[in-house]
Amino acid sequence: QHFSELGLPEYRELANFFTSDHEFWLAPAEKSSKDILICSSKNGRFILADLLPEDCRLLGVSATLEISNRVSLADLLGFPDAPLVRLDVAKQEQQEVYLIDDFPLVTDVSPFDYASEVASVIRRLQAFQEPLLVLFTSKEMLLAVSDLLDQPHLAQYKNGEPSQLKKRFEKGERQILLGTGSFWEGVDFSTHPFILQVIPRLPFQNPQEPLTKKLNQELRREGKNPFYDYQLPMAIIRLKQALGRTVRRPDQGSVAVILDSRVVSKRYGKQIAQTLSKERTVRVLAREQLGSAVADFLQSRRNRMKEKSKKEKR
């Protein structure tokens, strides 16, 4: 029943909220299933320009300001005419990215079967006895993989808050960490000399989320393609942020394995691979080649560190 039909004074404020020019939805709070949040959005995105004085000068510095050729972070925040100054980035030799081309397509198998395949890769990589970080895009997949692993590990939602898990992982309490959310962009792992990283799925935003749907509508009205002008570039940005979690020092090494075979089989996958390869080595491998590729890179890193140590002693 529509609240405006009730006609009761105590519902007036709530009725005004629901009948105003907003899109709204109900969502459970993250920390408590008993709390319900009333979320709303009039424009589909946060317009920073509306909150600042007209004479305010703003400088934004980030590795991810440019989203695509037609959309930038400045555009989305209400600064369509903001100039972008780009700096050249040197290619990182201490990190390689492996794209697995024969992994089951995530859209062709059940969530359980996909989780089983992910768990099998984790078991194989765990044999190297190096810290292993697995970044998921959903809580459900994370927990499903966790339930399938016999190896000791730390899992978000099971073993504590992200900050606690990070500390335990860096102390060496467990060699496997399963995480999502803030682990993609808000956590740095700088203590380990080498880290293995696994990304089971490409980090696309859920197209059914209210804010995403609203933003897609606005981009279409502006004559832009929501997927190629925003969703795909944002997924690439999130991937770049994730890859940066494990190379925080010049002497730190990392191998990242992207299991989602859409990065190889789909047309847009070429754009992802080309973008990532500008800053690091990207290789396309079959699953049976993964072990030898990781072993070779590990050995090359050890050899480089030995040579560096010898030079420093001279």
Language model features: what each stretch is:
Residues 1-314:
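ASCE RecA-like P-loop NTPase motor cores
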